[in-house]
Amino acid sequence: MEQSEDGDLDAGDELFEEVDGDGKGEIFANRELLNIDHVPDENRIVGRDEHITELANEIGPAVTGSPPNSVILYGKTGSGKSLVANHVMERARREAQRRDRRLATVTVDCAQSRGEADTVQTIADKINRSTSGVTVPTRGISTNEYYNRLWQILGTEYDAALITLDEVDRLSDDDILMILSRAREAGKVDVPIGIISISNKVNFREQMTERVKSSLGHNEMIFDPYDGEQLRQILENRKDAFQEDILMPGVIPKTAALAAQRHGDARKAIRLLRHAGDYAKTNNIGTVKESHLELAQEQAEVERLKELISGLPPHSKYVLYALANLTDGTTNSNDWFRTTVIYDVYEEVCKTEATDTLTTDTIRGLLNELAFLEITESNQEHGGMGKGTYKEHRLLWDPNVVFKMNPGSAQVDTDR
């Protein structure tokens, strides 16, 4: 390698000596194993063999170009729904390729692509090939045109398609479910399409219109939370993310126990273990200990909350900051607050963010969405004779976790 004027490039830059591009270092051997989106090999998946087989049976016809069934996967966060869907989809793609069939497989995070046009654009863009002759711009065309381009891509490039809509309950409109599932029947495209809908809400089907229910059929799978032993095994199967002898013996059992307290959330367990490793690395500690889990827990919660609200508009976050300020500032056991009280503090948050406020009705809608995501809880209250009804809201997260998402600008003075 050539030497620059600043010295020998082979020596590297000490500013970046702690950065391990391959996830390796003194603590980690393969940090990728602790990424939430990582899909492990089949022998690392715990307690979901029956789900894998059942889902494969439902969508299996797609590998031959025949019509697959659409399926709805229900379960709490971290119960393995996305993991199983991605695992089975990838195996289906490989099997179709082996059989010389062109199978489109695509996953859309509906928390990020919430509108119908955004979702269709994302699907079309992800499965598009250079040979299709079709372009899929991010904006500038109608929703109908996005559908037309999707049909063109499917018709020229594929024999079948499997579309996973993760967090499908976050979609602003469920029309897309009916349009996709009935596309072949309606003569839009001569390609069978199967939809895997993933929801954290067990009552999601009840929220669908009758037309959508009819289109999707009745194929449903329930994912129960992992128990403590399953969580321990999940972590054991990923402990080679660390260098040998880095994890102290009690770390994995304690991580599993902490995650089991929150409805068996495997995502939380994996996050906790990763953050504990990051803490040890950042502080130049040679091992990961049980005590590091307590320090890592809040950071894992911050990351989870960021994930939950990532697709929400900015003012949803301002409303959340307002409720966190009220909760943090309360001097009694009453942590329920009326919409009007939250709105007053929301106005203060908007001042710190140098932005205009939205209407009270709009804020009511944003509060309803936060409750839907189980970030807050809402109750309808009666004011008494002649005073009508009103809503009160309560934060379900530690206010400090909310503040740490946006240090410095999230806290305001709630004294009046």
Swiss-Prot record:
Pfam families reported for this sequence: AAA_16, Cdc6_C, Cdc6_lid
Gene Ontology MF terms: ATP binding
Annotated SMART domains: Cdc6_C (SM01074)
User: Which InterPro entries does this chain map to?
Assistant: AAA_16, Cdc6_C, Cdc6_lid, ORC1/CDC6, Orc1/Cdc6_arc, P-loop_NTPase, WH-like_DNA-bd_sf, WH_DNA-bd_sf
User: SUPFAM superfamilies given for it?
Assistant: P-loop containing nucleoside triphosphate hydrolases (SSF52540), Winged helix' DNA-binding domain (SSF46785)
Give residues annotated as binding ATP: 79-83, 226, 238
**Signal peptide location:** none
Which GO biological process annotations does it have? DNA replication
The lineage's top-level taxon is Archaea
Q: Which UniProt keywords apply?
A: ATP-binding, DNA replication, Nucleotide-binding
Q: Which HAMAP family match?
A: ORC1_type_DNA_replic_protein
Q: Which family does it belong to?
A: Belongs to the CDC6/cdc18 family.
Q: What does this protein do?
A: Involved in regulation of DNA replication.
Q: Which PANTHER family match?
A: CELL DIVISION CONTROL PROTEIN 6-RELATED (PTHR10763), ORC1-TYPE DNA REPLICATION PROTEIN (PTHR10763:SF22)
In Swiss-Prot or TrEMBL terms, this protein is called ORC1-type DNA replication protein 9
Q: Which gene encodes it?
A: cdc6i
